[in-house]
Amino acid sequence: MSQARPATLRVAVLGAGSWGTALAAAASRRHPTVLWARDGAQAQAMAARHENTRYLPGVALPHALQVSADLAQALAHLAHDPAHALIILGVPVAGMTPLCTELAARLPALGLQAVPLVWTCKGFEEQTARLPHETVQAALGAMPGLAAGVLSGPSFAREVAQGLPVALTVASGSSAVRDAVTTALHGAAVRIYASTDVVGVEVGGALKNVIAVACGICDGLALGTNARAALITRGLAEMARFGAALGAQQETFAGLTGLGDLVLTATGELSRNRRVGLEIGAGRKLADILASGMTAEGVRCARAARDRARALNIELPITEAVCAVLFEGLSPMTAVSALLAREARPESPTP
């Protein structure tokens, strides 16, 4: 770390889904932590049972973790010592704009505008095709002293909440953000690596979900592990090309938030994106899958990723194929055949 920080931070995690809850549990094992849930009944149940029965059933949460449905109360927890505090946004991409807009009104009034802030969502905003840092900049960029970054990496929330080992990357141009996240989470079961490549980390986190859907489709079609390995490898090339066009550092895609997260999401049994792909490959329709309650960020952001890539003239054949299957009625096997029929070309380690 670039400078020494106190042993104790005040942490507020905003968003009580599976990932927000898991990070709050990890932070609360060493630091005073408040988890904010928008749903009052959910917050009350979590506080009473020390369990998030909606998103992480069966996982016991630390008794030290405070849960509140009052955003003002969660932020007031930080106001006692704003110089030694951290805000973690645990909401999905779709929740970033409303939450950041609300924070823009609240943080300066409480003297919290310079508190380090990180988001954890992965994907492109559906309506705008923005990456999360662009959403944060649009909502909070005018706030003086803003220090922000992204926390990402190969991680299933349930395992983190259970205290199993995980390695994550915090990316920010601010050393205060990198240091605060390391202080809050780095410990026996959580290893934090630091980076300055916000764009690269975000592109990896977004596109790996789309590639994981493709890998699930491949597995659902029983095309074998060779085909899955090819999709993972060429999917990584798509991530690197997209990142290069946006100014990302290429080495980021060989790290935790690129290759690491892609392998986990494309192969892990807990991966929702892979499960959706498996169902598609087995012949189910997307509408039926979504109606059953199964959700996946790869479905939400696939079109936005494709549209932004087209606007930038970036070639993303796997992403294009996933969109054609999900939204345009192309059969999975026809999509595979089209990918295999592409013109032969040299393989290059660079985009």
UniProtKB/Swiss-Prot annotation:
- Active site located where? K208 (proton acceptor)
Please give an example of a GO cellular component term from this record. Answer: cytosol
The record's listing under Pfam families reads: NAD_Gly3P_dh_C, NAD_Gly3P_dh_N
Which catalytic reaction applies to this protein?
A: sn-glycerol 3-phosphate + NAD(+) = dihydroxyacetone phosphate + NADH + H(+); sn-glycerol 3-phosphate + NADP(+) = dihydroxyacetone phosphate + NADPH + H(+)
- Principal subcellular localisation of the protein: cytoplasm
Q: What biological-process GO terms show up in the record? A: carbohydrate metabolic process; glycerol-3-phosphate biosynthetic process; glycerol-3-phosphate catabolic process; glycerophospholipid metabolic process; phospholipid biosynthetic process
Give the UniProt keywords, A-Z. Cytoplasm, Lipid biosynthesis, Lipid metabolism, NAD, NADP, Nucleotide-binding, Oxidoreductase, Phospholipid biosynthesis, Phospholipid metabolism
Q: Molecular function terms in GO for this entry? A: glycerol-3-phosphate dehydrogenase [NAD(P)+] activity; NAD binding
- Intracellular or extracellular location(s): Cytoplasm
- Positions contributing to sn-glycerol 3-phosphate binding: K122, G153, S155, K208, D261, S271, R272, N273
Listed pathway(s): Membrane lipid metabolism; glycerophospholipid metabolism
- Identify the enzyme class: oxidoreductase
Q: Which residues bind NADPH?
A: S18, W19, R38, K122, A157, R272, E297
EC numbers on record:
1.1.1.94
| Similarity section | Belongs to the NAD-dependent glycerol-3-phosphate dehydrogenase family.
Q: Which NCBIfam families match?
A: PRK00094.1-2, PRK00094.1-4
Q: What does this protein do?
A: Catalyzes the reduction of the glycolytic intermediate dihydroxyacetone phosphate (DHAP) to sn-glycerol 3-phosphate (G3P), the key precursor for phospholipid synthesis.
- This protein is called Glycerol-3-phosphate dehydrogenase [NAD(P)+]
Query: Which organism is the protein's source?
Result: Bordetella pertussis (strain Tohama I / ATCC BAA-589 / NCTC 13251)
**Lineage from the top down?**
Bacteria, Pseudomonadati, Pseudomonadota, Betaproteobacteria, Burkholderiales
